[in-house]
Amino acid sequence: MKNDFNRKIVLEDGSEYYGYGFGYHADRVCEIVFNTSMVGYQEIVSDPSYTYQMVVMTYPLIGNYGITDEDFETKVPTIGGLVVREYNDLPSNFRYTKTLSEILEENKIPGIWGVDTRKITRSIRDLGSRRVYITDIDTPKEEALKIIKETPVPTDAVSKVSCKKRWYSRTSNHKYNVVAIDCGIKLNIIRSLNARGCNVTVVPWNTTAEEIEMHEPDGIFISNGPGDPEDVMQVAELVRKLKGKYPIFGICLGHQLISLAYGAKTYKLKFGHRGGNHPVKNLETGKIEITSQNHSYAVDSESLKNTELVPTHINLLDNTIEGVECKKDRVFSVQYHPESAPGPQDSAYLFDKFINIMKESKENA
């Protein structure tokens, strides 16, 4: 490996890691997190939930199979930055159309490779997620720390990634009309709904209950997304107004917002859950599901006791809440991603559950 480093990242605790720049050349302050997935870097880079975050990939080889046109989770990636051990700029894949570096450059996302990703990951695991600054090698540490301190923590992540006006994803022979609240929705969620006979109307995060009801939905979906759920309490208020009227299904941030709508509380995890192999127990069936996860916040289990929500899933690594349900209101949600691709398909049945609830609701209307 070369040793003429030209870029570095500086964490707010003063630690520095040197490497080589790739992608877009820019200095940027982000929150640093890590993901343990072996594959799926394209889906990670294009996941809106990583907005304002710099992701450390723990798997050492990244870029090997390039970028394909069909595997994006959003049209415009908004990840804050990417940190990898070894970057491969010569992909081998008959489907690839661009390199990872080209996609990062096109979307103004800085990357750095050649750093000790294991050491960084241990630091995040032991001390928690922190803010980080990616910059040139000759930037003084004191200047970098000053920039980190003076850069405000963003609270507009959802509004940054949500659509600005409604759009449609239709399928032939559809049976159900679903309105999806876009807090940073992944395209594979929409594909999963389309594949089950749903026409999907995607609306901005700040759409009113009255506007949603004008679409006469059979069900409402609250999407994943970035940031602190308490920054978008408007969506929780929306759930309060619509629960009991329509079946509602939420994923990730949507799960947290549904929980807030029922009076539960959320809190920030020390370093979050990000990877494709998190074991989750279904409390109704006793089965263990291997899940794909990407979140910094979780629902407080104690706060659920005073609500109408019942826990349905728990994480077997730390016993955090992974799913809740209010059968009376036909509302349920999970913290993880049942639509994950690439990733485990153990939880794809949750989309079928949503379909069945909508079917029963239409039959009993």
Which stretches of residues belong to each language-model region?
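Catalytic beta-strand/loop cores that center a nucleophilic Ser/Cys/Thr
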Residues: 287-329, 365
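A glycine-centered loop/beta-turn motif at secondary-structure junctions
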Residues: 323-365
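Proline-centered loop/turn at the N-terminus of a beta-strand
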Residues: 110, 177, 247-249, 265, ...
